[in-house]
Amino acid sequence: MTITVLKSAPGLPPAPQGDAADVVQVMLARLRAEGEAAARDYAARLDGWSGEIVVSPDQVARASEQVPEDLKTQIRYAHDNIRRFAEAQRASALDFQTELRPGLIAGQKQIPLAAAGAYVPGGRYAHIASALMSIATARAAGVGQITAVSPPQVGRGVHPAILYAMSLAGADRILALGGVQGVAALAFGLFGAPPADILVGPGNQFVAEAKRQLFGPVGIDMFAGPTDSLVIADSTADPLTVAWDLVGQAEHGYNSPVWLVTDSAALAEAVLAHIPGCIADLPEPNRSSAQAAWDALGEVILCTDREEMAATADRYAPEHLHVQAADLDWWRGRLSAYGSLFLGELTTVAFGDKASGPNHVLPTSGAARYTGGLSVHKFLKTVTWQQVAPQALPDLARATATISRAEGMEGHARTADIRLEKLRPTLRQVGTG
């Protein structure tokens, strides 16, 4: 593979190891022992919130009145797309049964989880879309009870637009809690919520670490890191559009990588020339975030042809993969490692982040090599069942007993033998023994 790196990523300075893990471990131990009292104390000390933790329907209604009507309209538009896509996913998850041999019947069944916990970030940015992505998807899957948490703002509580989105998407219970205490409330079933079977939704390093430490007794959507995006662009792409797509994703934060992969040196140089102006056009703190991410983690890679571009993209396995190149059908068929694929100049990643329909909770840090993003399937248990009739028993019992004894598992073999012996008289009568 012959590639040229036109802009390299020097990377971030080493982060202190163990700090977040140690802090989270101590917090979870206290929350597990002291429950709601500890959660209230952390909310007061860390978020400056001493108000009600459980958000009542009346509070949601009053908060919704503060949301501008145009914003409500656009939230409903996004919710409708997300819900429709999730419902289509649910329809694709089918129960079935099949007769493998005469009398040997097996099947598959989809069972929704009893309870889900959705974490909705609310720090520097009000992540309205995250509420829709997590809650609407769980609702489409048929989850029994959905509890949502989001960090309260000092003197105000949960952001009104987030509350509106949570309610619209179908949350059964909303808690004004953020950080580790919010995740713990979902996992442990605090404030009247049932303990969650799965924890979903993005968050900062402490939220991600809390989910990691809780995983096992409770499921999680994924181990998520900073968001990342890769743009594939050929000579047909518009350099200014590509530059804005890179900068628009870099504004997520100083630790959000963005990569451009192209086979056009002219396009690469033009994009590099546009980047500073695009960053300068952003307001603060977005400008500083985008600049830091671009300086430390932005890369521009020049390849010889589209096959090399595709191979490079697959090696990076980005969370978001945006193709602005000719022959989109070829790219859709060739690319194989990404969280979500955005095809064509019109299909900016921001559409997927906010409103187009497919879920924006996606694998990061190269995890797209082996897994996909949040979907209704995360809220479903795909279980199997089997049933044996007399005519299937002789062959099945012999195979089981023989394999079991070859493995040294005599007890397993006896469970097959005893059934064959009990049915042998009947099997002789029907001529199958």
Curated annotation (Swiss-Prot):
GO MF entries: histidinol dehydrogenase activity; metal ion binding; NAD binding
Active site: E319, H320
InterPro entries: Ald_DH/histidinol_DH, Histidinol_DH_CS, Histidinol_DH_monofunct, Hstdl_DH
Cofactor note as given: Binds 1 zinc ion per subunit.
Protein name: Histidinol dehydrogenase homolog
Family to which this protein belongs: Belongs to the histidinol dehydrogenase family.
Organism domain of life: Bacteria
EC number annotated for this UniProt entry: 1.1.-.-
GO terms classed as biological process: L-histidine biosynthetic process
A GO cellular component entry from the record: cytosol
Cofactor(s) for this UniProt protein: Zn(2+)
Pfam families: Histidinol_dh (PF00815)
Residues binding Zn(2+), per UniProt: Q249, H252, D353, H412
Keywords in alphabetical order: Metal-binding, Oxidoreductase, Zinc
Stored PROSITE patterns: HISOL_DEHYDROGENASE
